[in-house]
Amino acid sequence: MKILLPAFFIDTIPNMEIQVASLRDLGALRRLENEIFKKDAWSILDLMAVLTWSEVVRLKAVVDNEMVGFVAGDPRPAQNAGWIATIGVDPRYQGQGIGRALLRACEERLNFPTVKLTVRISNDRAISLYEKEGYRTVDIWHRYYNDGEDGLVMEKVLQK
């Protein structure tokens, strides 16, 4: 299923499509996760879960029939918020607006007034993107990552 993009993304990345991801994308997603996140890459079981759990918003960015980005959004009705569970773009395609397009598409489909995410405190590039997209740091989770690095909890209040 193709997802319509705002004109900005069509003009800057004319051959990119955002599509709903499925279990058929497991191999491509695993390669992408390992390339992007290396030591933080999700296990095959985690990837299978995110691709099959019916409530998760899962979208992929495709350029020339190749998955070059992915985002998963986790609805949390009890918190009246959605969480960006993971988002990543192939290093060859970073800086071209694909991450922004995936983030916005996921926010829209989560359909909550607030969207949250966690990011490594050292990931300046991602933090910059999130801040430009309206996210603000609301908490620090100390030693959140396996190697002991802190995670920033960022939140965006959407205009609904």
Regions found by a protein language model. Give the residues of each.
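Conserved N-terminal glycine/acidic-rich loop preference
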Residues: 81-85, 124-130, 135, 142
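Conserved GNAT acetyl-CoA-binding A-motif
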Residues: 103, 109-121, 141
